UniProtKB/Swiss-Prot annotation:
PROSITE patterns per record: GASTRIN
UniProt superkingdom: Eukaryota
Protein name: Gastrin/cholecystokinin-like peptide
GO annotations of cellular component type: axon; extracellular space
GO biological process, one term: digestion
Localization annotation: Secreted
Residue(s) carrying Phenylalanine amide: 92
Principal place of residence: secreted
Modified residues (Sulfotyrosine): 86
Described function: May control digestion processes.
Length: 102
């Protein structure tokens, strides 16, 4: 009887240890990710704070129009399926309606 109690206590302790270990690893990974995000946020803030007013204006006047022009040219690439796939679907629907009418 004493052996069964000792074995059950030992198994319970091992199970608890096995369940607690992944939780601590998950928490440490979560804290590591938060630290990385806060470091990158701080460096961005420091970079923006270190720029002079003229440098900020230069970035706004040159970089933003360039980005907007790239985005406006890239609109065709955002919807590559528009002509290719939907035209076939419309033909399929038209053929289906013609078959049921005749």
């Amino acid at each position: 009887m004493d052996k069964k109690v000792c074995v059950s206590i030992l198994l319970a302790m091992l199970a608890i240890a096995a369940l607690c270990r992944p939780m601590t690893e998950l928490e440490s990974a979560r804290h590591g990710a938060q630290r990385k995000n806060s470091i990158s946020d701080v460096s961005r803030r420091d970079l923006l704070a270190s720029l002079t007013h003229e440098q900020k204006q230069l970035i706004m006047s040159q970089l933003l129009p360039e980005l907007l022009s790239e985005l406006s040219n890239a609109e065709d690439h955002l919807h590559p399926m528009r002509d290719r796939d939907y035209a076939g679907w419309m033909d399929f629907g038209r053929r289906s309606s013609e078959v049921t009418e005749s």
